Amino acid sequence: MFFKGIMYIIYMLAVRIKGIKYSYLKKYKGNEAADKFVEEIAMKWSTYTIKTIGIEIEVEGKENIPTEPCVFISNHTSILDIPILFKTISKPIGFIAKKEMLKVPVLGYWLEKAHCVPLDRSNAREAVKSISEGVKNIKEGFSMVIFPEGTRGKRGRVGEFKKGSLKLATRAKALKVPVTIEGANKGFEDERRFKPCKVRVVFGKPINPSELSKEELVELATSIREEIVMNIKENGLNWCDNSI
């Protein structure tokens, strides 16, 4: 794993240098060409990361991913959730992420180019701006991923969804797709080191907000969390911070 780690660092440095090509494409070929290049970088990076660590991914409900831009609402188990979702969704996506994530060398640079939106929960005004930016991304054709727990769950547990965490999903008026990630925490978070693991990703049926009553919209976060918890319990696991 030490040798793989060295090779991965070299790979990431090479990926950062490709930012030169991104700048060229954006300036001379336009946003569409630049965005396609970012999508290519994201897919190659996620594939390389998953292969290097030795992650086996089982995907269920791939057919539930809409062709149009949507909001993916997922539990958050590990930093590996990002490459796993890039790989399994296989379409242009951005993340609503803690502002600290966009400061990570190399990764932060490309997350920003991939239309990821930094979120500062301690600043209400900036949080509103972030939501507006996420809505704008969806209108421009980019799906967004939300982690309503606001932080990674310990040992894969599903934490409570933060109050107001689905404001983007509500304002965007786009389809909402519940996503369950199970097992990624074993690839890093549990022992704070990378190691091979098996991951299960489940895409639930899209939720059309226009078909929901006001009461159902209010309870949307709770119902999606319940769906995620039940998907995990199907495997005989009880990874929930609170019983339902």
Feature map (PLM): residue ranges:
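Non-catalytic C-terminal accessory region of glycerolipid acyltransferases
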Residues: 2, 128-244
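Membrane-interfacial terminal anchoring regions of lipid-handling membrane enzymes
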Residues: 1-40, 57-65, 218-244
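Hydrophobic alpha-helical segments typical of transmembrane helices
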Residues: 45, 81-84, 97, 106, ...
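Thr-Gly-centered strand-to-loop micro-motif
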Residues: 60, 96-98, 120-121, 148, ...
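A short, well-structured juxtamembrane/interface segment
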Residues: 44, 48-69
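Catalytic core of membrane glycerolipid acyltransferases/transacylases, capturing the structured
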Residues: 12-29, 38-39, 52, 66-124
